[in-house]
Amino acid sequence: MSKILCIDYGKKRIGLSITNSIRSIAFGLDTVNSNNIICTLYKYLKYEDIDTIVIGLPIRFDNSLFPIEKDIKKFIKIINNKYPKLIIKRIDERFTSKIANYYLINTRLKINQLKKNQNFLDKDKISATILLQEYIKY
């Protein structure tokens, strides 16, 4: 079975996550500068068996869309043109950043107590992982 890649799109940074081959678990993959996303996407699509990309849908509490949705739509158009066989799915991303921040706060406290490396603590990658885990749950 092919894997699913998830994108948490931001103006400056983009978080990426990926499922295992049986699509049961989401793993944080990377955080990239938004200027490098096409090259990074190409790299993962070349070396991983991915047939679906899940992209967060930035919805406000009143159900209107955040302005960044215009950039996301342009990005999706680029993906569709370059990779027409890829399936693109959207998922409501409300609360994922808050959940990621909560996770980071709690994890940093524990890590600081243990004096370990904090490089793996990345809100964008964690947000993408939360989004993807929500997607594969259903």
UniProtKB/Swiss-Prot annotation:
The keyword Nuclease applies. This is Putative pre-16S rRNA nuclease. Pfam families: RuvX. Could be a nuclease involved in processing of the 5'-end of pre-16S rRNA. Keywords: Cytoplasm, Hydrolase, Nuclease, Ribosome biogenesis. Its EC number is 3.1.-.-. Belongs to the YqgF nuclease family. Its main location: cytoplasm. One of its GO terms (biological process) is rRNA 5'-end processing. It is found in: Cytoplasm. CDD domains: YqgF. One of its GO terms (molecular function) is nuclease activity. GO terms for cellular component: cytosol. SMART domains: YqgFc (SM00732). It comes from Karelsulcia muelleri (strain GWSS) (Sulcia muelleri).
